[in-house]
Design a protein with these regions (language model features):
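Conserved phosphate/metal-binding and DNA-contacting active-site motifs used
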Residues: 1-154
Length: 154
């Protein structure tokens, strides 16, 4: 893939934007016709797991290196950029499931605790990610404890 082709790739541009902000990324598989591009018919995490040929150690291979990121997307231009959360990038992500449960839980939290602070929001294939500053300490596993359809990622 030529430089001009990669420079117009929105997935590459998203990965580079994260890197510019000090957030380490890695390439993960994408979806083809509703199935994971990894080719496994029974893939347990479609379009959400690292590409082993590019990042064999998964999130431990996440980087902010523009050279590495460009090489990854030259090899796999359809790859989705995944963010290494927690201390590696200084962010915690709240994964809001796109079904009614996730957004209902989010509204209930806002009703109890007030509006969620202004933050970066990214639409995902099945909902939304909200980005918050990493608090400096590892949070205990809170999956499902904030409400149905809400999962913090760090």
């Amino acid at each position: 893939m030529s430089h001009s082709q990669t420079s117009h790739n929105p997935r590459l541009q998203a990965a580079l934007a994260h890197a510019r902000h000090g957030r380490a990324v890695l390439p993960v598989y994408w979806s083809i016709g509703g199935r994971c591009a990894c080719g496994r018919a029974d893939c347990p995490s479609p379009a959400k797991h690292p590409i082993p040929d590019l990042a064999p150690r998964g999130v431990k291979h996440a980087t902010t290196s523009r050279v590495v990121i460009r090489a990854w997307w030259a090899h796999a231009p359809l790859a989705n950029p995944a963010l290494a959360t927690g201390e590696a990038s200084g962010v915690v992500v709240l994964d809001v499931d796109g079904d009614h449960a996730g957004f209902t839980s989010l509204r209930e939290l806002e009703h109890i605790h007030g509006d969620i602070p202004h933050t970066q929001k990214v639409r995902t294939g099945s909902g939304q990610h909200l980005y918050f500053a990493y608090p400096g300490t590892h949070l205990k596993n809170t999956a499902g404890k904030l409400g149905p359809g809400l999962t913090p990622r760090q």
